[in-house]
Amino acid sequence: MKKFKWCLWLTGALFILMTAPSLNACSLVGETIPQNRTKEQYEFEKTFEPMFNFLEQEQKDFNGLEAYNSRVYIKNGDEVKRYEIDLGITKADGKGDYRIQIGENKKTVPVSYSNGKLHYDSEIDPLFDEEILNLVIKRDVFDSLNVKRTLRTGTTELSEIIYQPENNSDLFQKLKSKYDLPEETTCQIRIDYSDKTNYGITIQLTSKEMSVKIGLTIIKKRG
């Protein structure tokens, strides 16, 4: 009987030793850390889930939001263009302003937003790109990117992830085509989180002669 118990104990010990390496490969039960993330990066990225969830939505859900901002900056040689939508949110709809700046010329018109569409109080040209306003980015786009740098500051409550530049994703190809950017263009994505309510993404497309920066910010209601 003692010999049987000793063999049973030895079998259990060997099992633990054999399974230990596989257990170390997981940060949490049922969760495997991707090969292109450290454990710290993987856990840190989870704090940006509200932004990832919003970006995945085909039909944007503004419930629980206080404000939404969408902007595009285009620099082509010496020419600079800025387009920005700034919305305050009431229930699922938004009201705010559309601002254009082309060179030194500026114009602002009131706008409202409902059911994925912008409505302008007066004529303006060009209209804001609603594909950018309702930009959809699936989570696997972020999962495929390598992390270049992370930042977390206690003084300003700012958290940030900067991903390595890339030029292969479907998102990049789509935006490169939209803005007629040259082949040598690269794309870099940054996401940020601050003040416990503000989430943002910046997509920077850069070539020798041209630069396009797309930014989205959501501000969640407190409480």
What function would you assign to each model-found segment?
Residues 112-157, 163:
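Flexible, processing/modification-adjacent segments and terminal tails
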Residues 80-129:
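An acidic-aromatic
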Residues 170-223:
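Gly/Pro-enriched, hydrophobic low-complexity segments
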Residues 60-66, 86-97, 156, 191-200, ...:
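Short, solvent-exposed coil/turn segments at beta-strand boundaries
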Residues 144-190:
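Acidic, glycine-rich flexible loop segments
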Residues 19-71:
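N-terminal leader/targeting segments and the immediate start of mature chains
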